[in-house]
Swiss-Prot record:
GO terms for biological process: carbohydrate metabolic process. It is an enzyme of class 4 (lyase). Disulfide bonds: none annotated. Keywords: Lyase, Thiamine pyrophosphate. PROSITE patterns: PHOSPHOKETOLASE_1, PHOSPHOKETOLASE_2. NCBIfam families: PRK05261.1-2, PRK05261.1-4. Belongs to the XFP family. Its cofactor is thiamine diphosphate. GO terms for molecular function: aldehyde-lyase activity. This is Probable phosphoketolase. Its EC number is 4.1.2.-. Signal peptide: none annotated.
Amino acid sequence: MTSTLQATDIATLSPNEQAAIDAWWRAANYLSVGQIYLRDNPLLQEPLRPEHIKQRLLGHWGSDPGLSFVYVHLNRLIRRLDLNLIYVTGPGHGAPALLANAWLEGTYSEVYPNCQQSTAGLQQFFKQFSFPGGIGSHCTPETPGSIHEGGELGYSLSHAFGAALDNPDLIVACVIGDGEAETGPLATSWHSNKFLNPAQDGAVLPILHLNGYKIANPTLLSRISHEELRSLFIGYGYEPFFVEGNDPAILHGVMASTLATCVQKIQAIQAAARSGESSDRPMWPMIVLRTPKGWTGPATIKGHVVEGSWRSHQVPMADVLTNPEHLQLLEDWLRSYRPEELFDASGAPVAELQAIAPIGDRRMSANPVTNGGLLRRALTLPDFRDQAVSVPAPGKSRADSTRPLGQFLREVIRHNPDNFRLFGPDETASNRLDAVYEVTSKVWLGDRIPEDEDGGHLSDRGRVMEILSEHTLEGWLEAYLLTGRHGFFATYEAFAHVIDSMVNQHAKWLDVSKREVDWRAPVSSLNILLSSTVWRQDHNGFSHQDPGFIDLVTNKSARVTRIYLPPDANCLLSVADHCLRSTDYINVIVADKQSHLQYLDAEAAARHCAKGIGIWDWASNDQGASPDVVIASCGDVVTLEALAATALLREHFPDLKIRFVNVVDLFRLQPDTEHPHGLSDRDFDSLFTVDKPIIFNFHGYPWLIHKLAYRRHNHNNLHVRGYKEVGNINTPLELAIRNQVDRFNLAIDVIDRVPHLRDRGAHVKEWLKDQIHDHIQYAYQEGIDRPEINQWQWPF
């Protein structure tokens, strides 16, 4: 239980406390420099020689001393107040600092026994950093206590707030680099304080680290006036506190006092909200920490300023192997931290350092919140079949495919009121998931006006997170998952590209965690629904037509990626149920929100989705015979058009043997040697044959199917139709025609590919061409598709 702050006995450092804190800080700085430079002689027990230096110097020094300065002062508060606190570092290239503190706390040696708190362990600890066969240069999954790698900048603050949601006893201290603060995602994520409820959530303490420089340029926020900077953060809704200077003897006391004040304010805000005394949105505290970049490092090198300059960003001296003067300067730098006072004869931190470290799970490097799979509780999932649509016969009835999903998510929220959230950029209702508002609301701690009561669904305790920033939403959700909870992200398909790179980074995190870090427990999967899809963006036009997000996902590791394109509502329910049960994956579901034909009842949908791919017997007529052609589909709209083409062909050529294959799990198309969901060649051939033409109607860009299936035996006969970047304000059929995924073009393709139809099908082919012309002209004249298109049903 976190104790309440007594400002009178914690705000002031005693001389002994200050000495111990400064010693820890010196030790962390020594370890940070050692990781960048040393491969041997870790405690300088002999003069430094070239053979003690790594052949290739990699890493970043500039942010390390500031990060360790914050770390040790947070540790003091954790010990004194028994705080549940974790640390998120935006400058992930400052990993040497995080690793150093984890080693000093003993956590690193616990999870990596080869890096014990000994001279030999320290030598290994130094050598492995940014070294082949070792560890990376950022706060990777291998880093104890990390939930944020920080390689790609901009996401630290949204991750911090995501971790704090539904974690009422947690404080997340988040260091934002002043370079990172220039990114768009970070700039928006300051507004996360309008979504944090002090009555039920934890707290985030943002610490903007103004060390003044990026790689080779000054930072914007370090070059504006104090008053402008203060006004900026007051405008964001924070109460800023400033810690500024370069003299550790002074700044230790200022930092201790400032942190004590901030924690006191956090606890007061939470107490007022939880007692019902206040329902106003609070002004949360934040800290602006202005210290030199490369603090405590060499002041100058060759007459150039280094400490307090961009020159300290990475490796201040890269030529120590060949420059004896710089080698001596490095040794002097390392000895300036007085390592003989910090480590005992065995190489372990001295007792005075160990005495100020938090204990057990209270160590930031060992806090179970940062290994959220340990805390994860499986969702209590209702039976998705309770929300299934009735399907008396395949292709005879219509339903909005995502509306039943909204009803299912409503029940998920009802059964899991404190560890599941739905995320979306102002599109929950648009994507027809609004049934969730029957049991919850949208989180909103901004001002509310009377008109909001009429359908606004705003509340300070909702389970739906909506802000028009896909970056912020994705950051919230990633951290919510990494700290042991569950979520679901629904967005427009075309604008999922906004978070391309974030999803890419999360995939890397999951892959490394599964492949390299056995002490990280599985976390809930990142589930993304892409709706308002390319084929029904006829009202928004070309800018909203882009199915390429799934192309990005196919580039990521097969260990962590899954893509599903359910053809109807019941398949969507089955897929969603499966994804919400899974761990350590990125599950992408593509499903349109509009009214579509329904094909499978709940049980048939469950069977079909479990297989991921299969022959639709009711749409085929090749039973007991070899097919003349295989018509395949993947995606909802293209499945309808493929079925309509099948029906046309069967009406005009009753003797034509057609096999209809539908794909839900896109990775079933890959060989099983490349993806765990891939089909064996034998199973693939049994579905698609080894020598018959395959007309494949695909939701996305057609070349993606070729990429996945290029090694298959019958690839030469695989002809894929998909979106080809042709679109505008179109009717649904017109858009399909423009991209040749429509029923008429597909039927023509079959006539061209099946040898015995090339001559006898000539008249039908001409009729199909006329249909294309006539339907386009009708769309131009009436603005809609013909009734026989809009009302089409499976005729058999």
